[in-house]
């Protein structure tokens, strides 16, 4: 309904009474043929200001319309947008007895049965207009003279197609005289000009062509790879052979290995090996593998990783990447096809990757998954390729995100990234490409209209965990998921503590009924993650803090101004446990430490801006202004003051009864423990 309302509003804004006798209004006769239908005769409007050929859904049978690969949005001069979701491919329009083929017609109710756009005029150029006729050039060899109409009608209304079916007894609706009817055409200065299109046919076609050039199911596609990414791996002790005994395999696993080894050999990412090294391969079948219906082969490189020289090149900090996309309106993302396999190993390094499986002894020609150096090697190559585009592109290992302020810029940005991929032979997965999205998944987050939250599968993992855990490894996995979502869970440190205590080395593993009840309560209180605000650079920031005997908590907020009204929006949560020595601090010092820890957590947002610290601790406001004179007993306070001096902030004291943040934290924690 919203879409229909929006479309009606756009039509109302742009409609005008059109005088068909105006020589600038070009109408010509056209004819369509469809199997099972009588000939459909139309009065077509030739509009060189419209980039696309557009038809009403009432003149082309429903079975000939298909969903567009992605919604086509057109923007008109007043800033309004129209979304086109249906297209008709490869249609023949008969004009003056000649067949004119149109690759794509777009469905939109414009008030006219058929609009012949500029793409048609370019396809059959030169297009020449006279007072009484127009000329299209067929096959660029001979002209077709077409008479202009002085009176045009619209036949495409409800029931028209039913009446046009062969042997139909339905009476054809009366045609509507366009000359006396208001129509939703876009007049001079308000029409669907090429400059005002979000995605024009020509531009989108260019993007599709570029995407096709860089996409393949083969990460070493010989027609697309440039093989510019190379790597080398070294043993700390070259004289040492790294051997791990082979594993035993079930008949089902042997059958699966047979298929996968053949696939890898066909792709030329592995080859038979005579290496003195060996590591066992095995199959995993976790949730992701079950969803795609195929087990994943993994090589246990634990021993080899201990024996090789590491690579200290780190992937970028995720928070840093998120700050780059603040305020951006439109996104596209790309995933490198089996990214590590696009990096060729030198001849000396390949024997180090040797592995055993039921089919024999093999080694990799490319960087395999499981080597500790793999993420660093790949990130370095990707940074070298895309660093120049940092203002509108970020890369996290094999994930590429393009972000822009508006649609026009985004078309250019996406084209530049795809051209760079083509230049370097970086091969992408077409299945995973997301183009021109306002809502997108990146780094495990769902980013949408200035907000972010963990993707749905994070919550699924939490809910699917059993209430009764079997061992410390299983508990570590559960706590790891909670830590991943820590920005979205207030006072997580307190929630984790009872479970984390069971991981101590000197504590034997024991899972009790009380532990099961606690696990159930934790999961019950994590039924959804709130979308948090992504602060804009111009928004004023606030941190609110709280401390108890054993824990500290903090929250980052932003003040959003909308039509003169200030709204405080939550951006992040942080929490932690005080160390053993810190638990002995005075309560004032704990409150100060809570502020410091919170600033550290959110430092990427708080440097170099002026922000507000809000606390219910009366001491902190005076503490930042005290002049300590080097008393050795107060060394900690002097250090804290010096550290805080690097930041610019004001302090606002609030009454404890007004500290809704502290109350909220306590309430959330008590819900879990009650």
Curated annotation (Swiss-Prot):
Its EC number is 3.4.23.-, 2.7.7.49. GO terms for molecular function: aspartic-type endopeptidase activity; endonuclease activity; RNA-directed DNA polymerase activity. Keywords: Aspartyl protease, Endonuclease, Hydrolase, Nuclease, Nucleotidyltransferase, Protease, RNA-directed DNA polymerase, Transferase. It comes from the Viruses. The keyword Signal does not apply. It catalyses: DNA(n) + a 2'-deoxyribonucleoside 5'-triphosphate = DNA(n+1) + diphosphate. Pfam families: Peptidase_A3 (PF02160), RT_RNaseH (PF17917), RVT_1 (PF00078). InterPro entries: DNA/RNA_pol_sf (IPR043502), Pept_A3A (IPR000588), Peptidase_aspartic_dom_sf (IPR021109), Rev_trsase/Diguanyl_cyclase (IPR043128), RT_dom (IPR000477), RT_RNaseH (IPR041373), Viral_Replic_Matur_Polypro (IPR051320). It comes from Cauliflower mosaic virus (strain D/H) (CaMV). GO terms for biological process: proteolysis. Residues 267-447 form the Reverse transcriptase domain. Encodes for at least two polypeptides: protease (PR) and reverse transcriptase (RT). The protease processes the polyprotein in cis. Reverse transcriptase is multifunctional enzyme that converts the viral RNA genome into dsDNA in viral cytoplasmic capsids. This enzyme displays a DNA polymerase activity that can copy either DNA or RNA templates, and a ribonuclease H (RNase H) activity that cleaves the RNA strand of RNA-DNA heteroduplexes in a partially processive 3'- to 5'-endonucleasic mode. The polymerase/reverse transcriptase (RT) and ribonuclease H (RH) domains are structured in five subdomains: finger, palm, thumb, connection and RNase H. Within the palm subdomain, the 'primer grip' region is thought to be involved in the positioning of the primer terminus for accommodating the incoming nucleotide. The RH domain stabilizes the association of RT with primer-template. Belongs to the caulimoviridae enzymatic polyprotein family. The active site is at residue 47. This is Enzymatic polyprotein. Residues 40-130 are annotated as: Protease.
